[in-house]
Amino acid sequence: MYTSGYANRSSSFPTTTHNAARTATENAAAGLVSEVVYHEDQPMMAQLLLLPLLRQLGQQSRWQLWLTPQQKLSREWVQSSGLPLTKVMQISQLAPRHTLESMIRALRTGNYSVVIGWMTEELTEEEHASLVEAAKVGNAVGFIMRPVRAHALSRRQHSGLKIHSNLYH
C-alpha cells in the first residue's frame, strides 16, 4: 500500500493546537465566578459538572483551594477523581460568614487556579461583583457551591435554559 510522504510526516500542529486551545480556555475562564446550586441529597451532579474543569485547571502550577463548611476531602476521592493531590488545599470548619471574605482574598492573590466555597445564602450583586473583581485580579476561577433542599427549589420560579440531549432519549 502506498501512502504519500505528506500523510506520514510528523507534525507538531495537533500539540500546538491542543496547547493553544487549553491556554485559550484557561484565559477565557479567568475572572469567572459561577454559582452552582444543587440538591443537597444529590451532590454527585455538581461533581460530574465540575470535575472536568477542575482536572484541566489542575494542570496549572497553581493550587486549588476548597473552603468547606464541615466535610473534609477524602484523599482517596481526590486521587480517584483525577485531581492533583499535591495541588489541592482545603480549609474546613470555616464559618459561613467568613467564606466570602476568604474567597475574595484567595482569588485576589493569584496563587490559586480555582477557589471553591460553600455558601448557604444567595449572594448580593455587590458580593458577586467583589468576587468577580478578585478573580480577574488573580486570573482565577471561583465556584460558589450552594446546596438546597429539594422542596426549596420547587417553591421558586427559575429562569434559565433547558439543555436537551439525545444522549438520554
Curated annotation (Swiss-Prot):
Induction: By DNA damage, as part of the SOS response. The record marks 169 as: Essential for degradation by Lon protease. InterPro entries: Cell_div_suppressor_SulA, P-loop_NTPase, SulA_CellDiv_inhibitor, SulA_enterobact. Residues 106-112 are annotated as: FtsZ binding. Is rapidly cleaved and degraded by the Lon protease once DNA damage is repaired. SUPFAM superfamilies: P-loop containing nucleoside triphosphate hydrolases (SSF52540). Residues 162-169 are annotated as: Lon protease binding. It holds the Pfam family SulA. Keywords: Cell cycle, Cell division, DNA damage, Septation, SOS response. One of its GO terms (biological process) is negative regulation of cell division. NCBIfam families: PRK10595.1 (NF007892), SOS_SulA_coli (TIGR00623). Belongs to the SulA family. Interacts with FtsZ. HAMAP family: SulA. Component of the SOS system and an inhibitor of cell division. Accumulation of SulA causes rapid cessation of cell division and the appearance of long, non-septate filaments. In the presence of GTP, binds a polymerization-competent form of FtsZ in a 1:1 ratio, thus inhibiting FtsZ polymerization and therefore preventing it from participating in the assembly of the Z ring. This mechanism prevents the premature segregation of damaged DNA to daughter cells during cell division. This is Cell division inhibitor SulA. It comes from Salmonella dublin (strain CT_02021853). The lineage of its organism: Bacteria, Pseudomonadati, Pseudomonadota, Gammaproteobacteria, Enterobacterales.
